[in-house]
Amino acid sequence: MQEKIGLIPRSILRTLDRFRKQLFPNQETKTITLQEFQVSRQQMQVSVVTFLTLVLVPLGVNICGKTFLVKPFTQFLWNNYQTELFLNQFQAQRAFTEMQEIEDVLFFDSLIQNTNFCFNCSKAWNNYFVMQPSSYSSNSNFVIQKPDLANSQSKNSTCHNSKLILQKNVFEIYKFSENTDFFKDKMYGEQIHDGVKNSYNEFSSKASNALSNLEAPLYLGSEASLPPKLKNFDSRIFTANQLNRDDKLIYMSLQEQPLVKKQNFLDKYQFAKHETQENVINKPEIYKIEGLLQTSEKDEMELRQDKLVALAIQYNEESIDAISNLIGDALTCITITFLFFGLKVQILILQSFLTESFYSLSNANRSLIIIIVTDLLVGYHSPQGWKLLTQLILQHYGFPETKLFILCFIGTFPVILDTIFKYWIFRHLNRISPTTVLTYHRMIE
């Protein structure tokens, strides 16, 4: 049956009829309006409940499952049935880099704490000197010099402000405050190049005329008065052989200028006993210093071991967390799948509510939202964000951070998303709201 065509279009008649009902509502109009409001309210309530269900239920399953089931089981298997610490070589590389940073920090702290090399002793020492390396290498020369004598030298001397620094010397000599109880034990001779209990570096001494203008012998730690002035003597220069960064220097106490003689063909020297004085090294006090050195080195070693053990525990927990994240997220995906099958009607209502809310916006607002989303996901600056996101996901699941995989993912996945957006704009948005598409293209241009 063919419908009659009137003089006035039907759309105008329907608009006038709707306008009349709003101006002069009857009981039927009020009932329809109330029903529409109730339907809209119920739709919003169902949409909110469905959205919260889709978010909170999988999140709760993930947290509770990993905390009470997955992680304890994974931790038990990982710590008892295998010996590996890392899941992949990239995780091991990060651990080794952090380990090197810890070593650098500990070495820097040791340089700051041991500036004066005073063994952390509360007593100050009188007329005794400590050689502190600032930037040394093997076969570095250093000269033992008394500050009292250094202050009395001429301007041509190499002594300045109670310090002695030669051209090839990287050591500085310091004087401590007065205390006469430190070296009060009887002193007796000991060969320097043999060391004490084989705990110190081998030292050799040789004659040098580097300080021939001095008028008194090089002299350490005497509790008596200065010896008679001598002229034209040779200063004593000690050379530390095979000196490493962690080595400590011998703390020596010399009371008189000892004579030096060659011991054998290996050019090793030893101090010969003086006719009037036999004291060269205070052996009991050297033992005390040896104990302090061993204690200091033991503390440093224990601190280093504690740091490394904490680092190993951290990366072991990271491996366990990665496996737990993989299993827990798999449970989350299964939960979401069941929710989608069980809440089909509610999800349709939620979809209708979101669509209606989106299309109720103005054309400019819709275009702005589309531009923000597309620029974040497939914009010109998005590759760095995708790279960071990919690395975080791989670390989250303990997968190797292969550069080839990351580059391939960044080069393909944003392109696929861009194609999907363009298809949606052309297929659906252009049919539902052509003005929005026009506004979108104008804003891009």
From Swiss-Prot:
Keyword Cytoplasm belongs to the record: no
Entry's localization field: Plastid, Chloroplast inner membrane
InterPro entries reported in the protein's UniProt record: CemA
Membrane-spanning intervals of the chain: 44-64, 330-350, 368-388, 405-425
Membrane topology label: Multi-pass membrane protein
Main localization (coarse): plastid
Catalytic activity: K(+)(in) + H(+)(out) = K(+)(out) + H(+)(in)
GO terms under biological process: potassium ion transport
Gene Ontology molecular function: antiporter activity; proton transmembrane transporter activity
Transmembrane keyword on record: yes
UniProt keywords, alphabetically: Antiport, Chloroplast, Hydrogen ion transport, Ion transport, Membrane, Plastid, Plastid inner membrane, Potassium, Potassium transport, Transmembrane, Transmembrane helix, Transport
Gene Ontology, cellular component aspect: chloroplast inner membrane
Similarity comment: family membership: Belongs to the CemA family.
Function: Contributes to K(+)/H(+) antiport activity by supporting proton efflux to control proton extrusion and homeostasis in chloroplasts in a light-dependent manner to modulate photosynthesis. Prevents excessive induction of non-photochemical quenching (NPQ) under continuous-light conditions. Indirectly promotes efficient inorganic carbon uptake into chloroplasts.
Name listed for the protein in its UniProt record: Potassium/proton antiporter CemA
Organismal lineage: Eukaryota, Viridiplantae, Chlorophyta, core chlorophytes, Chlorophyceae
Gene: cemA
